[in-house]
Amino acid sequence: MRHSLPYRMLRKRPMKLSTTVILMVSAVLFSVLLVVHLIYFSQISDMTRDGLANKALAVARTLADSPEIRQGLQKKPQESGIQAIAEAVRKRNDLLFIVVTDMHSLRYSHPEAQRIGQPFKGDDILKALNGEENVAINRGFLAQALRVFTPIYDENHKQIGVVAIGLELSRVTQQINDSRWSIIWSVLFGMLVGLIGTCILVNVLKKILFGLEPYEISTLFEQRQAMLQSIKEGVVAVDDRGEVTLINDAAQELLNYRKSQDDEKLSTLSHSWSQVVDVSEVLRDGTPRRDEEITIKDRLLLINTVPVRSNGVIIGAISTFRDKTEVRKLMQRLDGLVNYADALRERSHEFMNKLHVILGLLHLKSYKQLEDYILKTANNYQEEIGSLLGKIKSPVIAGFLISKINRATDLGHTLILNSESQLPDSGSEDQVATLITTLGNLIENALEALGPEPGGEISVTLHYRHGWLHCEVNDDGPGIAPDKIDHIFDKGVSTKGSERGVGLALVKQQVENLGGSIAVESEPGIFTQFFVQIPWDGERSNR
């Protein structure tokens, strides 16, 4: 069916870049050259006519200054000898006529000798008879002509006659037409040069644009924009100077940046971005930076930065990042639930074993031993599990602590929840996730500090009061060296060797993001104690 054809097949394809550029440049060149031709042709007509008139005037002035002409005017026309001189000059300069008259307009020379002695035809001689040079177009006996007139003076500067020279008008027109054709050929040559230059320009543009047509570039741009705006990861691109050139919607949301804000410009973003993400090494050495955890405006972002190369030259860098905070919180909450389930599973196996013991004692009818065993089991449960569940109202935190108690037991150590501990459930997932992160790091650090030698003890105290949770984690391990304790929360600082020192920095960051605080005390060889204080919505959750 026709309507099922792809849209691209139904859409009319635009003209190619070469065709578009050639047509546009040709139209511009033709318009410009046409205007130049019209203006120049108008000027060249006047210039040609004026040039011929000036040439004729020069000849006329030369004759007017000739002594032979002056002397000849003192005689009768047939006896003056002026005819021979005038004809020689006329033929030499290819003129239509040279007529010398006296002050009565009687001819002393003419191409047709029989007209000598007759009056000059035309009133355009009158100005010359009054002492003024004159240029006019008029028809005489010979043809329509461009005629110039100049007065003749004697030695006393008294006018004694006039020299009239005629140029055939068809000759003037022919010279103008010759000039016009030279202009036309110049215009055509200019068009040809312009088209050749346009073809060269098109080839250069095609190379710059990788052989793509404009509509293909616009399609690629639209596809790129749609792709950038559809992905959830933030994307920020910079040029070789570190200036931000591209930012997608996800990045704007993660960075709380909006292009529409008048007070926010890409240059401002470039400055703040360079302070957060150091792209100088990537731009300089081309070394990618992968899986960096960076906090931007209370968000924990996982950033990857890679160089952008063109012909082997680094021309910029692209950073992609995503919000790791939400993922981490969900993983921590899930981890707490998994720990809770593992703890229940372990306890179910343990109680199954106890039931088998009880069943065996019943078969043996050892009722006294059975009574003692049941009482002991109940007391142990109350001390270990029942007491913990009574103090810790959050199932996630309770399951998490039970799993850590079992882990400490498996490692040969003891994890104790202080008897004065009291923790209501919180209505904030952020607070629960932060507490799990904090307790998890501090307890694991304590277990590692205690080492493989059994017998170590870890104490956890959780105390809630007036919207604040106070947490203490104490161990009797080797402690922290004095030269490291002041920097223990710095990223990369660890008592456990290289490639460590991230956990406590993350704990401090998340605690402070909630508005809380964390501190440490340690006596080498005796104890280490961490103090944590975070807001806790315990009262809201119990309403």
Swiss-Prot record:
User: One biological process GO term for this chain?
Assistant: regulation of DNA-templated transcription
What GO MF annotations does this protein's record show?
ATP binding; phosphorelay sensor kinase activity
Disulfide bridge map: none
Instruction: Using the UniProt record, name the top-level EC class of this enzyme in a single word.
Output: transferase
Topology within the bilayer: Multi-pass membrane protein
Q: Name the source's superkingdom.
A: Bacteria
**Subunit annotation:** Homodimer.
Q: In its UniProt entry, what is this protein called?
A: Sensor histidine kinase DcuS
Q: Which organism is it from?
A: Escherichia coli O6:H1 (strain CFT073 / ATCC 700928 / UPEC)
Q: Which gene encodes it?
A: dcuS
